[in-house]
Amino acid sequence: MKLLWQAKMSSIQDWGEEVEEGAVYHVTLKRVQIQQAANKGARWLGVEGDQLPPGHTVSQYETCKIRTIKAGTLEKLVENLLTAFGDNDFTYISIFLSTYRGFASTKEVLELLLDRYGNLTSPNCEEDGSQSSSESKMVIRNAIASILRAWLDQCAEDFREPPHFPCLQKLLDYLTRMMPGSDPERRAQNLLEQFQKQEVETDNGLPNTISFSLEEEEELEGGESAEFTCFSEDLVAEQLTYMDAQLFKKVVPHHCLGCIWSRRDKKENKHLAPTIRATISQFNTLTKCVVSTILGGKELKTQQRAKIIEKWINIAHECRLLKNFSSLRAIVSALQSNSIYRLKKTWAAVPRDRMLMFEELSDIFSDHNNHLTSRELLMKEGTSKFANLDSSVKENQKRTQRRLQLQKDMGVMQGTVPYLGTFLTDLTMLDTALQDYIEGGLINFEKRRREFEVIAQIKLLQSACNSYCMTPDQKFIQWFQRQQLLTEEESYALSCEIEAAADASTTSPKPRKSMVKRLSLLFLGSDMITSPTPTKEQPKSTASGSSGESMDSVSVSSCESNHSEAEEGSITPMDTPDEPQKKLSESSSSCSSIHSMDTNSSGMSSLINPLSSPPSCNNNPKIHKRSVSVTSITSTVLPPVYNQQNEDTCIIRISVEDNNGNMYKSIMLTSQDKTPAVIQRAMLKHNLDSDPAEEYELVQVISEDKELVIPDSANVFYAMNSQVNFDFILRKKNSMEEQVKLRSRTSLTLPRTAKRGCWSNRHSKITL
């Protein structure tokens, strides 16, 4: 038994790498068991081992060499599609089709596949009429047919190029000539007709199928708008889940790739990734809807307003039962916003059991240990039939069990709607940390394998969404779409009217970084805008959750905006003033890991508000040019992560101190980088390459009142403070005094200043 176990353990051995022109392969040796006839006569007759009775066969082992491509030219990667089909390596085909947009266009891949490898009537083939040539042509034909079938089935959106659909037309012409009447030809023809029909509907003013609408339902009837209190909590949660699931199922997974998402704010790409933008818009609409319903009626009494908050907490709990983590997070974030949290009298009227329920729901999105709770929950319940809830509150536990039992009795299975920012942040971090090319200019396909791990999770959860069996409620959707949403300034002003600001002598919690964020960076990718000046009244941290630096801050104010300035609210007004600061210090060292589902190329170092209004489009910095570093494919160094130094690399975030707010850009720092080189790379990413680099200095933010100036001759990797967040500022030299004067003229009593101040107003400045 021990020998058998050892044989199984050694059945696969790592053999190293093979390098050939245009490609690098990873080689493994695998022992494969084969059955042969026990006597020579049967073997001479060609009798297969599986055709003989037991006892007449003998087991033998054969060693097979398996090559997995790690990097290569585009030609080699496309050629490997054919060999992968022959080796039954369908995983490679899925990885390539899901990620090739990061290094090639649909036209380039299609031309290589069809013109170079798919020309079965070339002169060479015609001259050689041997049987082996015919068999080879048949093998290639079957391989190409299988690849095209998978392409049309898995990535149909690649061919959506209205109005003429050139790639789809080229593919259809090829299939008509080379494979008439085949299944791929029928699929291509049906897809072309579908695209053309949708284009006609769009031209006629009908809603596009890639955005959420009630296109399959009758028009909403007019009439008086219903009141929010008229809708039951389970109905609201079900309708929100219906809308979220419809949008999530339409998300094109490869649009989430960091290399694609980072191009969205270019002028020519304003229509890029519409399915993701629609999901973001729905998230933000719900967040603002929660705030509007709570603040909307000035005539409401404190008890009535508390009832509305209680209702939203119950709706969030129903969303949890439905495994709708997108709406759950939106509601929690809205209730944590500054304009809602500051209503102390209102929160005091919320029943204690609902406050405890709210804390438990908020803890799901705790950033402790790189958002471990939400990750484990998603992995555990992603494809399960029902939610699995455990509550420390007895009343909540009983209510949950009753609801779950009712679902089981009715035979209703639930899908899962994830928080999309989880995947976007992961893919953005992967794109930032891993190189596109290795030595020799070969495409780093190992990076694409890592990205596919995230893409595969998106596709799996999209399939799980088909388990939902819900129909739209016209009355609720009409109410939801007609809600008048408030801007951040409007909501805060209204909040102050409802409950006046506390006196200066009143003890209030210190500013903190919330553990729950909203989709405010989905339009920012690796860029994050932060609010440098905390308001007077800020929410406190949860009684049990941790706060601090979060890499899961992905959100957007509106579908049309590219940037979002922010601050964030909190969870419970139960803490004492000293508790939030203690929790903040305990959790400030938390960081994100690159292999996880919730990383981002940049985290948040200041407060984020789910209800922020976008700044002027004229002030939006252009997207940075993506730099390509050349590294060896044989490197075994772990990918760098934010807020953590590996052996000789790490990721830092750099913002420019100006009047447009603080937008962070992520930069990979090595142990060899000097200050001038880091400044030049930061200027390139912030589109400041036209300015002289000598005019700027690099400053690390130590705390709210301390900063560290990196000397021009220093090695940044060793000069920086590795015990605090890796947040830096690119500042013009000799501008400190002028900026402090500007800040001193800004009112300190208003909750929001007319012009954003800079981070330069700190009490202590450390110079090496």
Curated annotation (Swiss-Prot):
- Report if keyword Cell membrane is assigned: no
**Result of changing residue 699 to M:** In a breast cancer sample; somatic mutation
Residue span(s) of domain N-terminal Ras-GEF: 65-196
Alphabetical UniProt keywords: Guanine-nucleotide releasing factor, Phosphoprotein
Any one GO biological process: small GTPase-mediated signal transduction
Domain Ras-associating: residue ranges: 648-735
- Keyword Transcription regulation listed? The answer is no
What InterPro entries does the record tag this protein with?
A: RA_dom, Ras-like_GEF, Ras-like_Gua-exchang_fac_N, Ras_G-nucl-exch_fac_CS, Ras_GEF_dom_sf, RASGEF_cat_dom, RASGEF_cat_dom_sf, RGL1_RA
* One Pfam assignment: RA
Describe the location of the Ras-GEF domain by residue ranges: 232-501
Tissue expression per record: Expressed in a wide variety of tissues with strong expression being seen in the heart, brain, kidney, spleen and testis.
Annotated Gene3D superfamilies: Phosphatidylinositol 3-kinase Catalytic Subunit, Chain A, domain 1, Ras guanine-nucleotide exchange factors catalytic domain, Son of sevenless (SoS) protein Chain: S domain 1
The Phosphoserine modification is found at 520
Q: What molecular functions are annotated in GO for this chain?
A: guanyl-nucleotide exchange factor activity
Query: Which pairs are disulfide-linked?
Result: none
PROSITE patterns, alphabetized: RA (PS50200), RASGEF (PS00720), RASGEF_CAT (PS50009), RASGEF_NTER (PS50212)
- What functional role does this protein have? Probable guanine nucleotide exchange factor.
What is the annotated quaternary arrangement, including any partners? Interacts with Ras.
The name this protein goes by in its record:
Ral guanine nucleotide dissociation stimulator-like 1
Native source species: Homo sapiens (Human)
